[in-house]
């Protein structure tokens, strides 16, 4: 049960399949010389994504969907698969430390202590992964992904039942970042239903991750999050963001590009993939496949 960076895991042979889960359905890819993509919608109410409560509301429907996508995979020897969870099912934070211990146990203990006041669930029993980056003025920035163990386990369970081993688990936005240019100071705004994930990255280093449920997926509600984010960037990083990447805006992408460019004074473009336009329910999967292509 691991939530981890993609690059360190992609040094090994890629898994047989990869799945991205959303309330709308499950996006899947059979990984080989050429990836075979599929998407199976879920009945409304099967999942309700949250970092605080049960996500799988209809386990039987979820299990049937997983088995349908797995096909003959379930009849073979148990194989590793990659599992991409919804952003809103976990919390991603970037913590800065004046000094960061070398011992992994001390690191984990220090991180959990820092998160106790900001994470609305029990951090001691939660599934957690993290990695360190060089920070400003000699500090260490640590990217932390944490989720209640019960939530992660419920997402994993149908895949294990179907004869698969979720050997790599990550979140949609982290996987989707593999589609973003690794240059300059950029912002990714990823919309999935009413959940907006905003990721600030300076070249390959994460600086800020926000994931919140909006009152509605309207332009006004998205702008109300982006404006203070861009102010934060300028105030804390000392310069303006150079590019805003959009994902999940669907038919409203062109309107969003024009409006955000005008209101934020930044270059705006959609997130792109060689395998098609990344959408609100498959951007993480396409990013993961891009990583495999780049690292193999």
Q: In which residue ranges do the predicted regions lie?
A:
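Hydrophobic/aromatic-enriched cytosolic interaction surfaces used to assemble or bind macromolecules
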Residues: 1-296
């Amino acid at each position: 049960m691991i939530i981890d960076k993609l690059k360190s895991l992609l040094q090994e042979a890629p898994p047989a399949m990869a799945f991205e889960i959303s309330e709308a359905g499950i996006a899947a890819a059979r990984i080989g010389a050429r990836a075979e993509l599929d998407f199976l919608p879920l009945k409304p109410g099967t999942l309700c994504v949250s970092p605080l409560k049960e996500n799988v509301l209809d386990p039987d429907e979820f299990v049937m969907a997983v088995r349908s996508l797995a096909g003959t995979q379930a009849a073979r020897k148990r194989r590793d698969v990659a599992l991409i969870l919804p952003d809103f099912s976990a919390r991603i934070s970037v913590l800065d430390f004046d000094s960061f211990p070398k011992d992994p146990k001390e690191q984990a203990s220090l991180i959990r202590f820092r998160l106790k006041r900001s994470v609305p669930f029990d951090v001691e029993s939660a599934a957690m992964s993290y990695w360190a980056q060089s920070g400003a003025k000699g500090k260490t920035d640590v990217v932390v992904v944490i989720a209640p163990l019960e939530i992660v386990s419920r997402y994993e369970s149908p895949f294990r039942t179907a004869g698969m081993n979720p050997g790599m688990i990550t979140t949609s936005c982290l996987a989707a970042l593999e589609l973003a240019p690794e240059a300059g100071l950029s912002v990714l705004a990823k919309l999935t239903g009413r959940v907006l994930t905003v990721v600030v990255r300076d070249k390959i280093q994460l600086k800020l991750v926000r994931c919140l449920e909006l009152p509605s997926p309207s332009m006004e509600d998205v702008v109300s999050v982006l404006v203070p984010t861009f102010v934060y960037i300028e105030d804390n990083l000392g310069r303006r963001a150079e590019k805003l990447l959009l994902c999940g805006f669907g038919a409203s992408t062109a309107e969003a590009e024009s409006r955000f460019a005008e209101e934020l004074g930044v270059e705006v473009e959609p997130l792109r993939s060689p395998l098609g336009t990344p959408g609100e329910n498959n951007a993480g999967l396409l990013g993961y496949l891009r990583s495999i292509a780049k690292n193999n």
